[in-house]
């Protein structure tokens, strides 16, 4: 085998560096391609880097607690045929010629951000280039389009991607009206109209799953496929009032931290920077009011009841669930349409698309026919 570098990945638009927090393997140990190799902490979340190839881990270049730019050399994988001198030369050459990635050096397929007027609102939308029906990504309660940072690149390799900050979230207008599901879906639909999108693969997480389903109902023929990840609003499913209330009301890091930890199976995934980013968002004008309106509407349950009564009108869907979800309880599978498929993800909480991104990406790619 050739000498294979392990490099600092780029997860999402805003990532320009990462910190090594844990190595699962030591130099000399044999790797299997795809197994967990190390954990990297970003400003959003901590995630695992998988081994890029099978073979001995010949050298670890980046130590624990070391912060390095995207693309930097972390380790080297190579079989015994490669001499130590060859490994040393490879590392020296890499370090000598390495230039940190910049926006100017990013590929033409990189996501571009824009603000799109939707009635009296403005929505922030990220898009990648390409031909064909796009993948439309709709995040959950309290999140933004960066919630898909571990999914965008994998999906963009197969189809154009449109990621949207829902009303009340991210950089979009904070006006959500009374927070009704129909209003959120209508705003997304108008944004897609502005982009000229007539057909799309709709993918929604949590509240975004309910929005995606409602959008598919309100615009027959729009959804080429429908993927719902830990979705709210399905039969037998309940959204945690404790989470919604805690998220909406928390004003300090020490209060928000245990709330965010409910999102994931491993609380260590919630970074200090992620907590601070959420607090910064909540301090924006209108953000608290938007969250309160959306939370009250979800807890009222009327929109979800209306959605459940029309599931049979929806196209076949993939529902991705985690048994460790502490925010949205699993639906009654027997009450779902017979054409729907359910996939369970082990070792994840409410955020399987972040916690187990490779598995979720593979499921989505299969669903969209990639």
Region locations from a protein language model:
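Conserved alpha/beta-hydrolase catalytic His-Asp/Glu region
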Residues: 250-310
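A short loop-to-beta-strand scaffold at the N-terminal edge of the catalytic core in hydrolase folds
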Residues: 119-128
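Mobile cofactor-carrier "swinging-arm" domains
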Residues: 1-114
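Conserved HGGG/HGGXW glycine-rich cap/lid loop of the alpha/beta-hydrolase fold
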Residues: 127-171
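Flexible "cap/lid" loop of the alpha/beta hydrolase fold
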Residues: 213-217, 223-254
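Conserved serine/cysteine hydrolase catalytic core
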Residues: 287-335, 344
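Catalytic histidine-centered segment of alpha/beta-hydrolase-like enzymes
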Residues: 348-361
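Active-site loop/oxyanion-hole signature of alpha/beta-hydrolase fold enzymes
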Residues: 163-207, 211, 362
